[in-house]
Structure formats: structure tokens, C-alpha cells
């Protein structure tokens, strides 16, 4: 995802990174011209010809989420206070299978044969959709939620996957870190807040309509994903819109 990509970029650019949260964006006339940061010693200003917000979503507003701790919606608040528009904030995608600590269990596991069971040990997805475990995320997430409410729990049985430990070592390690052994028994799962389709209103070039202010990635709402993003399309959006926004920002200086 984004963190490994950022690490690669920073190595190539050899750019300094200030570990300081932004408090607000700064204006100059009718355009954005930098940001006010909270760093060592208090507040300090960083002046810039353009500001590109790439702060992620707001999954941490939910009790169970796959998002990192920084995903608190601050970028959207910064943009809104600067006069940018927000849209589609109600469209939050819930990943259907997360472990109790929010660790994501990939759809690829169900694609390889993992089965969803309710607390009675019954496979239930065929009752909700002809595609069963391979139904779209929103369908599976709603089914998991309903079965948890109805029976008291939902479990993912990973044992049908051949060579599970070799195919999905991260999933096995995350489960074992919680004291679970997916090679011996199904593991408890639940829907978790995963991705915000809504955010700062932008065009396909990341421009917010405020001169000098751009946004890319989950913080932005380009409209590309509709109400239910397809898996992995967010990475493509971040790469394409991030690149286009950088070029447009240079033109906008």
C-alpha cells in the first residue's frame, strides 16, 4: 500500500520529512500558499506554491478498522476549513473479514477456498448471494453483520486452502499473534471500516477548486469508485491522480 510506496519515493527524492501534524493550510490572497505545522518548539509555517493533501481516510473514527492510526479525517477537515468542498462522506466501505484487532484477511483467501461459517457452524453465504463467498464486498459485509447479530458470531475457515501457511503467511502470523491457529480451527471475523469513497471534492487531476490546493488518494473524492470501490483500485487511483496532481500543481504555480 501507501507506506512502502512512500518509503521508495523518499529514498529516490532524498527529501527531508518533517514529523509534524498540520494544523491548517495557509492562504495568500485567493490561493493556498503553505501550511501551519505543530512541531518541536510549537507552531511553525511552511510556505509553498501549492499544497497536496495525501492524508488518507477516516477509518479510525470507527471502533474496528483496518486503517492506520493516522486515518482520522484531518486532511478533509483542513481542506474544508480552507473552503474546499466535501462529498459522499456516507459512502464508507467495510471490509467483510477482519480479525478482532482489525487486521485484514484478504478476499484472496475466500478466492482460494476459505468458507464463512456462523456461530452454529453453518455455511451461510449461499443464502445471501449466488456467488456465495465471492460476492461483492458490500454483500458479504452485510451478510457477516447479520449472521453475527443472528447467531452470535462469524468465523472464517481457512483450512480448505491447500498449503495455507505457504500461500498466506501474513494471515497465519496475524492470527497466531492473537492466540488463534487457522490451521486447526476457524478464526473469528467481523466487518471493519476499510475505505472512504467520499472526501475532498476534486477533479481527475486532484484539484480542489481552491487555487494551490490539491488532494490525492483516500482523502479525495474523485468519483472514480462510486459507492463501492473494487479491490486494489485505490492504489491505481493514488498513483495516477498523485502524478497528475503534481504536474498540475507545477503548472498552477
Which residue stretches match the model-derived regions?
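Core beta-strand elements of the Rossmann-like FAD/NAD(P) dinucleotide-binding domain
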Residues: 41-50, 208-212
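Glycine-rich loop(s) and the adjacent beta-strand/alpha-helix scaffold that form part
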Residues: 50-103, 233-243
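A glycine-rich dinucleotide-binding beta-alpha-beta segment and adjacent secondary-structure elements
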Residues: 18-31, 170-220
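An anion/pyrophosphate-binding glycine-rich loop and adjacent beta-alpha core
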Residues: 78, 84-187, 248-250
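Short beta-strand to alpha-helix junction loop
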Residues: 1-11, 17-18, 65-73, 98-102, ...
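Feature captures the FAD/FMN-dependent oxidoreductase FAD-binding
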Residues: 1-47
Amino acid at each position: 500500500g501507501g507506506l512502502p510506496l512512500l518509503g521508495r519515493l523518499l529514498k529516490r527524492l532524498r527529501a527531508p520529512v518533517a514529523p509534524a501534524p498540520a494544523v491548517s493550510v495557509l492562504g495568500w490572497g485567493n490561493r493556498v500558499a503553505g501550511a501551519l505545522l505543530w512541531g518541536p518548539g510549537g507552531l511553525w509555517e511552511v510556505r509553498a506554491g501549492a499544497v497536496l493533501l495525501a492524508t488518507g481516510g477516516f477509518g479510525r473514527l470507527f471502533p474496528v478498522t483496518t486503517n492506520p492510526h493516522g486515518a482520522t479525517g484531518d486532511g478533509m477537515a483542513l481542506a474544508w476549513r480552507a473552503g474546499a468542498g466535501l462529498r459522499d462522506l456516507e459512502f464508507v466501505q467495510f471490509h467483510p473479514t477482519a480479525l478482532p484487532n482489525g487486521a485484514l484477511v484478504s478476499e484472496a483467501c475466500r478466492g482460494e477456498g476459505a468458507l464463512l461459517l456462523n456461530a452454529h457452524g453453518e455455511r451461510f453465504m449461499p443464502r445471501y448471494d449466488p456467488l456465495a463467498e465471492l460476492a461483492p464486498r458490500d454483500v458479504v459485509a452485510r451478510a457477516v453483520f447479520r449472521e453475527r447479530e443472528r447467531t452470535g458470531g462469524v468465523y472464517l475457515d481457512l483450512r480448505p486452502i491447500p498449503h495455507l501457511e505457504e500461500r498466506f503467511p501474513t494471515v497465519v502470523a496475524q492470527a497466531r499473534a492473537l492466540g488463534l491457529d487457522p490451521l486447526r480451527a476457524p478464526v473469528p471475523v467481523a466487518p471493519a471500516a476499510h475505505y472512504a469513497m467520499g472526501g475532498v471534492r476534486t477533479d481527475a487531476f486532484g484539484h480542489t477548486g481552491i487555487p494551490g490546493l490539491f488532494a490525492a488518494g483516500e482523502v479525495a473524492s474523485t468519483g472514480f469508485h462510486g459507492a463501492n470501490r473494487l479491490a486494489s483500485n485505490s492504489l491505481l487511483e493514488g498513483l495516477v491522480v498523485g502524478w497528475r496532481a503534481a504536474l498540475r500543481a507545477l503548472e498552477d504555480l
